[in-house]
A protein has these predicted regions:
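Polytopic transmembrane helical bundles with strong interfacial aromatic enrichment
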Residues: 1-45, 49-144
Length: 144
């Protein structure tokens, strides 16, 4: 999962830079656009950066899990991995919807929150239990 988080994070940061250029070149840096549409463009742009940076952080610091954590952590990772993709969809779709509906950005933000809460639950405060579980876990190919 670690490399997947890193890859999604890097691609997401590149996507963030590309969407910034898109707003600048295609929409004249959002000049003359109504306030609601400009708000939707900019917030989705920042959600893309947010989701990408969370994935980068997980990719850099995620450690192997053992025991029940081996099953809970991937669920959290899937939710976090979906965040940049949903934010990117929100960037291109939501500004053109009527009103301030957020059918992509809202699930992206809540999914990232839920995923990180699952990662938090997996982070044991009892170090001895964690060490015992990791020693009992089979070698996972050097992923640390």
């Amino acid at each position: 999962m670690r490399w997947l988080h890193l890859a999604v994070g890097v691609v997401g940061v590149v996507g963030f830079l590309a969407t910034g250029q898109y707003m600048d070149k295609v929409h004249d840096h959002l000049r003359g656009m109504d306030d609601a549409r400009r708000l939707l463009f900019r917030s989705a742009h920042l959600y893309l950066l947010f989701g990408s940076l969370v994935n980068l952080a997980l990719g850099l610091y995620l450690r192997p899990a053992a025991g029940w954590r081996r099953w809970v952590r991937p669920a959290g990772s899937m939710l976090v991995l979906a965040t940049p993709f949903l934010a990117a969809a929100g960037f291109f779709v939501e500004p053109w919807l009527s009103g301030l509906d957020r059918p992509y950005s809202r699930p992206a933000a809540y999914g990232c929150l839920a995923g990180m809460l699952l990662h938090l639950v997996c982070r044991s405060t009892d170090r001895e239990t964690s060490r015992a579980e990791l020693t009992a876990a089979p070698d996972r190919g050097g992923i640390r």
